[in-house]
Amino acid sequence: NIHGDQVRLVNYRNFTYRSASDFDERYEEREIDVSRMASMDLIISYWKIGPVAHTFVSFNFDDGSPPVCISIEVRPEIGESFDPLSSMFKQFELIYIVGDERDLIGVRTDHRNEDVFLYRINASPEAVRELFRIYLDRINRLADRPEWYHLLTDNCTINVIRYARKVGGPHRRFDVNHLLNGFIDSYLYYRGMLDTQFPFAELRQRSHINEAAQAAAAEAAENFSERIRMNLPGIDQKVAR
């Protein structure tokens, strides 16, 4: 439900995990004020060493509210597992998961043993808010008219790039990094979309958040989102959220 800057998010995912396959499902409602949205982060998660990863985003607020995390994924049917080739033949429905970072990031760092990196995107608050509204519109349209995930034309990274173009992001229509998305951080770095105070290799090393996420989860820290951003490049540590 959207009323100006006031948005009610339904089916906001906030699972509690004991393992990757053993968890308590919890869907919540959350009220947010889009006018307090101030920045956004790109999260890249690698399930194995290589050029392919999963990318998703978090939208941050300047009033201390927890970030809103959005992940574009496939919705496999019971008994199905993701297959890249099959995804090009209308096999998997596209789904947008909106939820808590302790769920969407924590399950990857703590239970799936994925390597996760978090980068602050160089974007104005106005662009961030506009991008969030594009996501909302897309989510609402999918509820009425489902679409199919497609490895080459409708995947997690291509959609992020497509939406970013609408608010002034890089306009190159196609780049191999859109598919080999494990390199998307390098692609954005050399286009000025990430913090450039460090050489890229050092930025990447500093942006690895597994250790911080695992420590915060082990302590059941309420400030999980703040903890994983501590000392990350490009993020004001007075408001590390």
Provide a role label for each language-model segment:
Residues 1-3:
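Alpha-helical transmembrane signal-anchor/signal-peptide segments
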Residues 5-6, 10-12:
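Juxtamembrane extramembrane loops of integral membrane proteins
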Residues 7, 18-116:
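Glycine-rich catalytic cores of cysteine/serine-nucleophile enzymes that process amide/ester linkages
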